[in-house]
């Protein structure tokens, strides 16, 4: 990569790729030619760029995809920005016989086109006219810098041309290289435009920063002053961000910060959280890719805390059940563990539950408890099928449904005691003895 910084207004300087550029104040530009960038050029993208160029509309890669490419990562999702209005895009795609899908984003300037079996989400440059802390009324523009100004963080405010030219108006590239997470302009203003940006700040801090603790004082002050604004944000949006915080780096530092700055009560977290347990569990799970709820459950003292979280964030049934399971069993299964067969109580739980996700839940509990050796054994263990059915018991002359059920339970207990080794004939002979 080659780079040049242009700090003065409307100066004409020679760029690093040997052509003259007329650039606005503070615009930083450089040339990117990486394998990750080149890999984006599918047949669909080539057709898209050719169409926009033919109609004299500017088109660039925008936001998070640019950040990822500069970090040497191929982005999973690529968003595009353009000077063309939604009406112009629709006319252009219709004339070219290109199908458009999902028109829900049109009022915000987004058109999704399908080319060569790929979807391309293209959004018109825009400025926020009015904001209420959750949504914005937008106005379309052709000014790239104005669009960059409305974005949340400097590292997310860059654009990339298809010749590899980076357009960076707010030192996003420098912040990315220096592992800094900063709001575009004033933190307070950006946050009040959309209070969810508080959680986005924490999320990207966990992705970008090498060592925790380096925060801008103005940013932390703005977060503390505006934390209550998160009370008006939907639980679903909060949970999306919180899950990403919990699966990122520096999670212990960030959760403590969320409590210190008064954010926690507005996002469904308990006021009397068990932060000591959280400190211990965050170390236990490090390097073992826990599910977000596995770590979050350490903050909860009672199962009712999980229920309250669900009411606020609308978590999935699977996530709620995992939280309830961990809070209920995190101590009991440890107490039940026989030192000679430490995995046995966990295996018995899976056998008794007969639920398809029981093994996965137990594995999350073992991560929580820091039982890494048992976790490896559990992951390698295949749940054995219980060899006796009600039909088998009827064959030995027992027809009462109630009696069959009781016998099946007795046989299951004998089978468990044998380490799941007793076979059908052995178990049925046990009936005859009794």
UniProtKB/Swiss-Prot annotation:
| Keyword Plastid (UniProt) | no
Name a GO CC annotation attached to this entry.
mitochondrion
What's a single GO BP term from this record?
tRNA surveillance
Catalytic activity annotation:
a tRNA precursor + 2 CTP + ATP = a tRNA with a 3' CCA end + 3 diphosphate; a tRNA with a 3' CCA end + 2 CTP + ATP = a tRNA with a 3' CCACCA end + 3 diphosphate
Which residues bind ATP per the record?
64, 67, 151, 194, 197, 200, 203
Disulfide connectivity? none
Q: Where is the transit peptide?
A: 1-41
Residues that bear N6-acetyllysine: 402
Enzyme nomenclature, EC number: 2.7.7.72
The modified positions for Phosphoserine read 400
Q: Where in the cell is it found?
A: Mitochondrion; Cytoplasm; Nucleus
MF terms (GO), sorted A to Z:
ATP binding; CCA tRNA nucleotidyltransferase activity; CCACCA tRNA nucleotidyltransferase activity; metal ion binding; protein homodimerization activity; tRNA binding
At which residues is there a site annotated May assist in discriminating ATP from CTP?
152
- What residues bind CTP, as annotated? 64, 67, 151, 194, 197, 200, 203
Instruction: Tell me where on the tree of life, at the top rank, the source sits.
Output: Eukaryota
Needs which cofactor?
Mg(2+)
Keywords associated with the record: Acetylation, ATP-binding, Cytoplasm, Magnesium, Metal-binding, Mitochondrion, Nucleotide-binding, Nucleotidyltransferase, Nucleus, Phosphoprotein, RNA-binding, Transferase, Transit peptide, tRNA processing
UniProt site positions, description: Involved in nucleotide selection: 193
Q: How is the quaternary structure described? A: Monomer, and homodimer.
Return the similarity comment.
Answer: Belongs to the tRNA nucleotidyltransferase/poly(A) polymerase family.
The protein's job, in short, is: Nucleotidyltransferase that catalyzes the addition and repair of the essential 3'-terminal CCA sequence in tRNAs, which is necessary for the attachment of amino acids to the 3' terminus of tRNA molecules, using CTP and ATP as substrates. tRNA 3'-terminal CCA addition is required both for tRNA processing and repair. Promotes tRNA repair and recycling downstream of the ribosome-associated quality control (RQC) pathway by mediating addition of the tRNA 3'-terminal CCA following cleavage by ANKZF1 and repair by ELAC1.
Q: What is this protein called?
A: CCA tRNA nucleotidyltransferase 1, mitochondrial
In which organism is this protein found? Mus musculus (Mouse)
